[in-house]
Amino acid sequence: MRNIVVGSRRSKLALTQTNWVINELKRLGAPFTFEVKEIVTKGDRVLDVTLSKVGGKGLFVKEIEHEMLTGGIDMAVHSMKDMPAVLPSGLVIGSVPRREDVRDVLVSKGNLSLSDLPSGAVIGTSSLRRSAQLLAYRPDVTIKWIRGNIDTRLAKLKNEDYDAIVLAAAGLARMGWSDDVISEYLSPDVCVPAVGQGALAVECREDDVELREWLSRLNDEQTERAVRAERAFLQQMEGGCQVPIAGYAEVKEGMVHLTALVASPDGKEKYKEIVIGADPEEVGRQAAALLSEQGAKELIERVKKELGN
């Protein structure tokens, strides 16, 4: 029986997601044994600065992809939102399982909603996308950077001078946190989710026909189509973590509905469009073209310059 080595980051969430995929493959009757190999990524090592300063997309996947390309591992389970828009040659996304809740959530002291937080409230996030949209909605709050895993952030909220933090609903759900900890689910109208948020990407080598055949059985077609539209938009905008970019697609009656957003880090400049179509990639490209015409491309270049990228 073939042994499949699965690469994973060391965080509890990453290992939980990896083990979920392994158990699903076993449930489907995949003729493999599995072994998990923990890999430390650059994003795990550098915790004292914002993600945008460390170097954007790929921070949590590059080392893992290197292991896959050199034969150290056979597959890996990633959070889709950590995936760069373009994969290295020789690697493919073999499966996009059914998506979890895509929304961001607010966890606050006193269980207050975003609207009810007092003026000057300190909100913790490590995401420019979240901070830009929070500031657009509540220009009177203060954003303070926060890094670390879910447990670390919840502890910081309790013990440090944060009034609230924003997390992904999917991460909390996968880690088994109950709804009790959540003060408010942020509507995508208020905070458009990240491209790929709530979805997993199971990556493998392009030439591994046997493994790809089994991974394809885990694929959820609606999630995959939605994510393809979001990632096509991201690819066209050439945005990584350095720029507030958001994209969230749903498939309704066979049509892909994509909400796309580009904003300035302070939330004062915002471009947003909803595009509907049958072809996911075309929808993503169309959204990028519309936002670019309005000035989003210039904004991205300006923000990159200001950040020194």
Curated annotation (Swiss-Prot):
One of its GO terms (molecular function) is hydroxymethylbilane synthase activity. SUPFAM superfamilies: Periplasmic binding protein-like II (SSF53850), Porphobilinogen deaminase (hydroxymethylbilane synthase), C-terminal domain (SSF54782). The modification S-(dipyrrolylmethanemethyl)cysteine is found at C241. GO terms for cellular component: cytoplasm. InterPro entries: HemC, Porphobilin_deaminase_cofac_BS, Porphobilin_deaminase_N, Porphobilinogen_deaminase_C, Porphobilinogen_deaminase_C_sf. Binds 1 dipyrromethane group covalently. Keywords: Porphyrin biosynthesis, Transferase. It is an enzyme of class 2 (transferase). Its EC number is 2.5.1.61. GO terms for biological process: protoporphyrinogen IX biosynthetic process. Belongs to the HMBS family. Monomer. This is Porphobilinogen deaminase. It comes from Geobacillus thermodenitrificans (strain NG80-2). The gene is hemC.
